[in-house]
């Protein structure tokens, strides 16, 4: 994947934790997500409420590495990070 370059990486979350960040349930999935983040300028993450406040065994990235976070509900535990743009989908 190092031969490729992308403007935006849009990732789906396996698990998302306010302190631990993005994690994956499978090592190969975590490796691909890390490579996509390394090869892109913008990092977008999509997650629904079933993924937040969870952690899987394979850490991918901290929330500080994500530029835009798209959720289906507000996430009170997230706190306030001015570098992270949080978008809540309208139902």
Regions found by a protein language model. Name each.
Residues 1-91:
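Conserved phosphate- and dinucleotide-binding cores of soluble alpha/beta proteins
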